[in-house]
Amino acid sequence: MSGIIFGCIAPHPPLLVPSIGRGQESAVQITGDAMKKLANLLELQHPDTAVIISPHAESAADAMGILTAPRCTGDLQRWGDRSPARIFANDIELASAIRKEAKTSGIPTRSIDSDNYELDHGVMVPLHFLERSIEGVPIIPIAFSWLPLQTHYDFGKVIGNAAKQQQKRVAIIASGDLSHKLSAQGPYGYDPMGPVFDKRLVDDLSKLDIEDILTMDDVLIERAGQCGLRSFLILLGALDGLKVKSTVLSYEGPFGVGYMVASFEIKRGE
């Protein structure tokens, strides 16, 4: 089977990494345990390529960003981790196919072609848990835009179509956190719409109610102070037309920020 063979949602708090958390990772133990389960699920899929969407990538308002350079590097040293930078190969063939398919679909993209492109923590924190499951597999970092939500879903379809055309087995990892306004202790204070947003999104993803996600009120999204919605919609678009088992492996909201881990397994032979 080629095309999208697995999808997942992963949060990216740096303190999930023990060398950064230095004991504080116990406050997100539920999330850490779920990430280990996610790694086990991903390892079973044997992808050829992993597409990783990060809210903290080098973004532009009016175009999706796609790394087209042959390699990229990443570390978490700015967060206190002393591990050396990791080097990852990029699947430039599939990246080119995604850009071509996007152009055909009328979705603007831009090439990120820096030979020294540095992966952000939105990529590196999930990879701390998932890298062993995709060892030696090239990755394609993606940056979303501020184009409409529907455009992000449609861009996900583009990724799925390109994966099929290239006959690649592709796993897609959507990095993102939910509301940052769950409590007064959060980074942006409390807004009652924060918990409302998180409950609705977790429920919608459990049921794969994509229409409800796409029609979320702009005010709700803004007041929630979230960062992952567009990443998630690209993932959901990539799964369009497939029979999918959606499982929310965990959700918790310590530090006033919502963290969710979810898997999207393709049902085969049905």
Q: Which residues does each PLM region occupy?
A:
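Flexible, D/E/H-enriched segments
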Residues: 1-48, 59-157, 186-270
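Beta-strand elements within well-structured catalytic alpha/beta cores of enzymes
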Residues: 8, 48-54, 142, 168-176
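Structural motif
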Residues: 42, 164-165
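Catalytic metal-binding/acid-base residues of hydrolase active sites
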Residues: 56-58, 178-179
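Short gly/pro-enriched beta-turn/loop segments at secondary-structure junctions
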Residues: 134-137, 165-169, 175-176, 257
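Short, catalytically relevant binding-site loops at active-site mouths
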Residues: 147-149, 178-181
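Non-transmembrane, aqueous-exposed alpha-helical and coiled segments at domain scale
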Residues: 157-164, 170
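Short conserved catalytic/interaction loops centered on acidic-Pro-aromatic/His motifs
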Residues: 170, 181-185
